[in-house]
Amino acid sequence: MQQQNLFEEKTGFVSIDETKNRYRGYVVRLKKTEPKTITTQWGRVEKKEGTYQPKNETWQGEKEEELPDDLDEFDAVDIYNQICEQRRKRGYVDYSELRF
């Protein structure tokens, strides 16, 4: 699920392996306000109301990273896209690519 906003970009990923009973979720957010920050959240997800949501309504982990002031918005978006691409290489699928 890619949601674009004027001040924030957000992409959600899931990795599902029913044979191993593994349902993982991962969310990456880029806040474009000063200071620019990239927040990642991860944890187990379950399917509710047609979408994947965090199990027990909470994420298992969260990491927030402030980007240096000398980076402009384009550099921040590049770092954000690199993180998203790493998730895709590890087998995570974008919410929007799933068929319900």
Segment roles from a protein language model:
Residues 39-51:
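Short, solvent-exposed aromatic-acidic interface loops
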Residues 81-96:
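Short arginine-rich
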Residues 1-39:
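Short N-terminal "domain-start" leader segments
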Residues 51-75, 90:
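A short, exposed loop/beta-hairpin motif centered on an aromatic-Gly-Thr core
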Residues 10, 19-20, 48, 66-67, ...:
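Intrinsically disordered, low-complexity regions of eukaryotic proteins
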Residues 43-45, 62-65, 83:
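Short beta-rich binding modules
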